[in-house]
């Protein structure tokens, strides 16, 4: 049985890493490609677990020797996925999940148009701002300049949502995890005929509702909030008031999520 290549992308702070972590607990046979990066570890991150941390010089050497399937520069740091991850997953007949940004996703889709692409959106700028501030606080200092830079970049990234096959809005963690799981199981069913038992109809319905072309009405308030639809401009985005409250919908969110 051939493995499926899944791509998942999201603006920084959208909770993507948490979704991936929960998916791997609930669905077997999904390999996770650990990216290489030149950024320093955050918090409790460990080399070889969340990322393979390396120097800019070593990253450039790997780039020069064609090690990477895709690579990108994000917020001044380099990220890349090694080709070896895909080769090993294919050899084992496993699915492979790439947690990569919109630049890297575009590169992979150009080479492998059969890949299943998933984009994760935060519900609105206020929630994203809270998440980014909480992460900054977890690192020991609230850098408002960095928070706003990432908020503005998020709007630009969300503009690329039409390039993805599936769209998730990560407003309620359990629901978003269930949707991600349904997408993986539905793709296995359609591509490989994998049996999903008594849950089959419900799983297929949940996945179908997340297809980009079925999501326009569901996404409309999110796109309007980020100034992508309607009259709201980038300069008019409402990022909310200062708040020390945690985002109640994301108790399990990983503060290290890129």
Q: Model regions: which residues?
A:
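P-loop (Walker A) phosphate-binding loop of NTP-binding proteins
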Residues: 9-11
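ATP-binding Walker
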Residues: 14
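Walker A/P-loop
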Residues: 17
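Post-Walker A helix-loop "phosphate-sensing" segment adjacent to the P-loop in P-loop NTPases
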Residues: 25-33
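ATP-dependent small-molecule kinase phosphotransfer cores
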Residues: 35-96, 102-106
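A glycine- and Lys/Arg-enriched "phosphate-lid" helix/loop adjacent to the NTP-binding pocket
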Residues: 39-44, 90-95, 107-162, 166, ...
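NTP-dependent small-molecule kinase module
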Residues: 156-258
């Amino acid at each position: 049985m051939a493995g499926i290549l899944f791509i998942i992308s999201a603006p920084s702070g959208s909770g993507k890493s948490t979704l991936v972590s929960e998916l791997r607990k609930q669905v077997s046979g999904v390999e996770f490609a650990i990216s290489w990066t030149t950024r320093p570890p955050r918090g409790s991150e460990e080399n070889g677990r969340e990322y393979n941390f390396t120097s800019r010089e070593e990253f450039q050497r790997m780039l020069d020797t064609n090690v990477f399937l895709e690579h990108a520069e994000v917020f001044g740091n380099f990220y890349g996925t090694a080709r070896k991850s895909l080769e090993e997953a294919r050899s084992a007949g496993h699915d492979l999940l790439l947690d990569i940004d919109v630049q890297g996703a575009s590169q992979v889709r150009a080479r492998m148009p059969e890949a299943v692409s998933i984009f994760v959106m935060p519900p609105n700028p206020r929630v994203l701002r809270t998440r980014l501030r909480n992460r900054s606080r977890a690192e020991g200092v609230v850098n408002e300049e960095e928070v706003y830079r990432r908020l503005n970049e998020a709007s630009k990234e969300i503009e690329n949502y039409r390039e993805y096959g599936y769209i998730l809005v990560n407003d309620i963690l359990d629901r978003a995890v269930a949707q991600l799981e349904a997408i993986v199981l539905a793709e296995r069913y359609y591509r490989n005929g994998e049996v999903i038992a008594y849950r089959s109809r419900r799983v297929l319905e949940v996945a179908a509702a997340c297809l980009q072309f079925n999501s326009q009405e569901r996404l409309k308030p999110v796109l309007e909030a980020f100034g992508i639809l309607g009259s709201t401009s980038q300069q008019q985005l409402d990022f909310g008031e200062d708040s020390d409250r945690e985002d109640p919908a994301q108790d399990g969110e990983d503060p290290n999520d890129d």
